[in-house]
Amino acid sequence: MIPGEILPEDGEITLNAGRDTLTVEVTNTGDRPAQVGSHYHFYEVNDHLHFDREPTRGFRLDIAAGTAVRFEPGQSRTVQLVRYAGSGDIYGFQGRVMGPATGESA
């Protein structure tokens, strides 16, 4: 075995099983491409990406860790989001949440 090596069992691995998901139509209205990483808080992505933001609080892209989705200028696409696991507190990114993503104190 190599240090850090992972030896998964045979078969399919289901990502984010059992978590809440949300499908959103997103349009890049900017003049440059915008790329969003797998774990970026979708509510706080580039302001040139237009979509109904409020429902996306506490969600990220439902894609494999370390990957990203690129939106070319003028491009519209539908993406699936998944709720963050854990406490639901969101810190950092653009600083628009800085605490609970949902609930009375959000």
Curated annotation (Swiss-Prot):
Cite a single GO MF annotation: urease activity
Look up the domain of life of the source.
Answer: Bacteria
Report what the protein is called.
Urease subunit beta
Where found?
A: Cytoplasm
Protein's pathway: Nitrogen metabolism; urea degradation; CO(2) and NH(3) from urea (urease route): step 1/1
Output the InterPro entries linked to this UniProt entry. Urease_beta-like, Urease_betasu_sf, Urease_subunit
Gene (UniProt): ureB
UniProt keyword list: Cytoplasm, Hydrolase
Give the family this protein belongs to, as stated in its UniProt record: Belongs to the urease beta subunit family.
Which Pfam families does this entry report, sorted A to Z?
Urease_beta (PF00699)
Which EC number(s) does the record attach to this protein? 3.5.1.5
Q: Main localization of the protein?
A: cytoplasm
Summarize subunit and interaction data from the UniProt record for this chain. Heterotrimer of UreA (gamma), UreB (beta) and UreC (alpha) subunits. Three heterotrimers associate to form the active enzyme.
Q: Name one GO biological process term.
A: urea catabolic process
- Any stretches that span the bilayer, and where are they? none
What organism does the record attribute this protein to? Alkalilimnicola ehrlichii (strain ATCC BAA-1101 / DSM 17681 / MLHE-1)
What GO cellular component entries does it have?
urease complex
Recorded catalytic reaction(s): these are:
urea + 2 H2O + H(+) = hydrogencarbonate + 2 NH4(+)
